[in-house]
């Protein structure tokens, strides 16, 4: 077994006291902007946790494609594992981990589909090859071979060799509207800082609690 004790290093100094924040979205935006400058890969990557009909959890990395005070948005195939699980149980948890900053943000909330207009607008911004891939992929289904996938991609590419690629009807997005947002920052000797914002429903006022690490 690898001894990870020596991998621990001193937390970089940061300015300000994030525990003084009185609402979560502005704090999240500040942390995300700092992560964009610091993280080498995908600062908008987040772990998305859902639950299947048997109560067995699923988790996977996805990319957040937008956020505001209404919630956190991501896109995928509606018939994928995550899409089916969210249709059956529209609740989810998210985790952002920014290793370079020694920070993480945990989010729990209710999930609703984005509008067709939102999905269309985002899909139009994707590179054409990614748009073609969305048509060719039957996400979460069994795939015979990589060659079969490449054939499907080539077939779609030939169909849309000229002009715009429309959004597939089975591809859309979801918005996670949070009722819990927790901010955690590493400190020396595991004496970390941790605060949680909570509310019972969207639109209500947030309450803040400082938590033991």
Swiss-Prot record:
Substrate binds at residues 65, 122, 126, 190-192. Keywords: Flavoprotein, FMN, Oxidoreductase, Pyridoxine biosynthesis. It catalyses: pyridoxamine 5'-phosphate + O2 + H2O = pyridoxal 5'-phosphate + H2O2 + NH4(+); pyridoxine 5'-phosphate + O2 = pyridoxal 5'-phosphate + H2O2. Pathway: Cofactor metabolism; pyridoxal 5'-phosphate salvage; pyridoxal 5'-phosphate from pyridoxamine 5'-phosphate: step 1/1; Cofactor metabolism; pyridoxal 5'-phosphate salvage; pyridoxal 5'-phosphate from pyridoxine 5'-phosphate: step 1/1. Its EC number is 1.4.3.5. The keyword Oxidoreductase applies. Gene3D superfamilies: Electron Transport, Fmn-binding Protein, Chain A. Its cofactor is FMN. InterPro entries: Pyridox_Oxase (IPR000659), Pyridox_Oxase_CS (IPR019740), Pyridox_Oxase_N (IPR011576), Pyridoxamine_oxidase_dimer_C (IPR019576), Split_barrel_FMN-bd (IPR012349). One of its GO terms (biological process) is pyridoxal phosphate biosynthetic process. FMN binds at residues 60-65, 75-76, 82, 104, 139-140, 184, 194. GO terms for molecular function: FMN binding; pyridoxamine phosphate oxidase activity. Binds 1 FMN per subunit. Catalyzes the oxidation of either pyridoxine 5'-phosphate (PNP) or pyridoxamine 5'-phosphate (PMP) into pyridoxal 5'-phosphate (PLP). Homodimer. Belongs to the pyridoxamine 5'-phosphate oxidase family. This is Pyridoxine/pyridoxamine 5'-phosphate oxidase. The gene is pdxH.
């Amino acid at each position: 077994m690898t001894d990870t004790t020596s991998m621990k290093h001193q937390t970089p100094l940061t300015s300000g006291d994030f525990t003084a924040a009185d609402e979560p979205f502005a704090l999240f935006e500040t942390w995300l902007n700092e992560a964009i400058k610091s993280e080498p890969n995908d600062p908008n990557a987040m772990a998305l946790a859902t639950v299947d009909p048997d109560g067995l959890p699923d988790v996977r990395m996805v990319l957040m494609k937008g956020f505001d005070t209404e919630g956190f948005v991501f896109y995928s195939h509606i018939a994928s594992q995550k899409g089916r699980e969210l249709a059956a149980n529209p609740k989810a948890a998210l985790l952002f981990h920014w290793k370079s900053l020694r920070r993480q943000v945990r989010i729990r909330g209710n999930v609703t589909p984005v509008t067709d207009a939102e999905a269309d607008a985002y899909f139009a911004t994707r590179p054409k090859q990614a748009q073609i891939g969305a048509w060719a992929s039957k996400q979460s289904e069994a795939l015979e071979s990589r060659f079969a996938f490449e054939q499907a991609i080539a077939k779609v590419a030939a169909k849309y060799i000229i002009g715009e690629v429309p959004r597939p009807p089975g591809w859309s997005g979801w918005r996670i509207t949070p009722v819990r947002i927790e901010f955690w920052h590493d400190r020396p000797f595991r004496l970390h800082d941790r605060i949680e914002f909570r509310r019972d429903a969207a639109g209500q006022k947030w309450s803040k609690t400082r938590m033991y690490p």
